[in-house]
Amino acid sequence: MASLKLKKRDNGAEPDKKKLVIAGIRHQLLLLLRRRHRLFPLVSAVSGCLLLILFSFSTLSPPPLIHHNNQVAVEPNPTTPFRVPENGGRSDRQLWSSRLSNLYYACSNATDTFQVTDTRSQTNRYLLIATSGGLNQQRTGIIDAVVAAYILNATLVVPKLDQKSYWKDTSNFEDIFDVDWFISHLSKDVKIIKELPKEEQSRISTSLQSMRVPRKCTPSCYLQRVLPILTKKHVVQLSKFDYRLSNALDTELQKLRCRVNYHAVRYTESINRMGQLLVDRMRKKAKHFVALHLRFEPDMLAFSGCYYGGGQKERLELGAMRRRWKTLHAANPEKVRRHGRCPLTPEEIGLMLRGLGFGKEVHLYVASGEVYGGEDTLAPLRALFPNLHTKETLTSKKELAPFANFSSRMAALDFIVCDKSDAFVTNNNGNMARILAGRRRYLGHKVTIRPNAKKLYEIFKNRHNMTWGEFSSKVRRYQTGFMGEPDEMKPGEGEFHENPASCICRTSEARVKEKAKHVNEDDSSEYSEIGNVPISSRSDLDHSQFDEVIF
């Protein structure tokens, strides 16, 4: 009974409290009216009213919600300024592999209609080739030289590498590539020799016929322009040989291109060994890693005609370098960037990768030469991906010494690491990017990220006007079709070296599983340049062994 009375008394306390509050407010208002002519009492009255109002709200308002975890839930603010998340990402399986790759396999075998060397050999025709450009540009020349020799029914002399261009690398073919493998592996396709016979050398010592064929020269172009001279002189040299063969050839010639590129052209044992050492050291750091081919060297930026905010110093330095190319016209940097033809900056590449879902914890291998701006240019990328590595950070000076003074050999090491990475990304569409894109398609459609620079330009430019969620959503949408998935490119689209459609066949999943039994997937095995088939299982040089592999 006593408790019941107490409860009633408590219930009646609330109305009494309200009456007291109202009476207090009324009293203060009366004081205000009586003393309105005095400033100090006015301030006191207003202050008193405010205090009483605040007190009344605090006593009458309901109590705050209590959460089970004793923390107040905070809803994300959609107007939050652009801020890259400190941690996290969706480093899931989709980022590291193609879900459709099992439906395709490499198929570069010659068919029964392909004429082998023994049935079409001409012993009095010798083709000399002088390649041009950097290592991967020269690689395209080597590949097409074999096909040109086949078209002309000529004996190919091992191509000479470019030792006079910007890079000034004195390496010969045999210093970078396994020349004996190159000759023997293609013996059924084209006859290749290391040097001209002595009698031919003496004949051309004073009168070597050298010529340059047009770019994208077709088979009929070679037969019309080169064959008559070759028949007459017996020896012809084709100079500046890069992209001098048509992109559109018949299927047999395209398959020959693939046999050269993906099977016959492989690096020397010393380069392969060092390249594999770099890969192994990356694998010790993480199960998966991304390789970035960063073309941000001064010559690349000068050639592009783009501007990166370095003021008058940048304009003078790159402008002077650009004048070395006599055929280049004055560039409109903003127009070039708007059209997606500017190499992405290290920061932009980092933002794109984070937007795609690669977390801050991902290990990143950077394949690059001298970066314009040095460490200051790389700092934003390093902030986005602190686990950043190069061949210099992964090795000692002693280990790298045999390669350090040769730009082509250093580029070959980067090529191997990029080729064997789980995901490959590039900031431009240069020769190495194209060669690797095609190779990774041929060897199993491994994740290969090519920036959709024309679309990305707008979101990079306006990123501070959007949230991170909006930014990453747009990055993923714009990069659809630029991730190395099968069927992203139609047959014949782009350079053949980046889209070897004639050498990639579709198969059923059942056939894939059946043939996959014969593939050794142990990463610790010794692999050749052909892909995932251990060297020990390929002692024979017959082409038929290679197309039975599903990559």
From Swiss-Prot:
Pathway: Glycan metabolism. InterPro entries: FucosylTrfase_pln (IPR024709), GDP-Fuc_O-FucTrfase (IPR019378). It is a single-pass type II membrane protein. Glycans are attached at N109, N153, N405, N465. Its EC number is 2.4.1.-. CDD domains: O-FucT_plant (cd11299). Pfam families: O-FucT. GO terms for biological process: fucose metabolic process. Specifically expressed in the root hair. It is an enzyme of class 2 (transferase). Residues 515-539 are annotated as: Disordered. It is found in: Membrane. Substrate binds at H293, L294, R295. Keywords: Carbohydrate metabolism, Fucose metabolism, Glycoprotein, Glycosyltransferase, Membrane, Signal-anchor, Transferase, Transmembrane, Transmembrane helix. GO terms for cellular component: membrane. GO terms for molecular function: glycosyltransferase activity. Belongs to the glycosyltransferase GT106 family. This is Protein ROOT HAIR SPECIFIC 17. It comes from Arabidopsis thaliana (Mouse-ear cress). The lineage of its organism: Eukaryota, Viridiplantae, Streptophyta, Embryophyta, Tracheophyta.
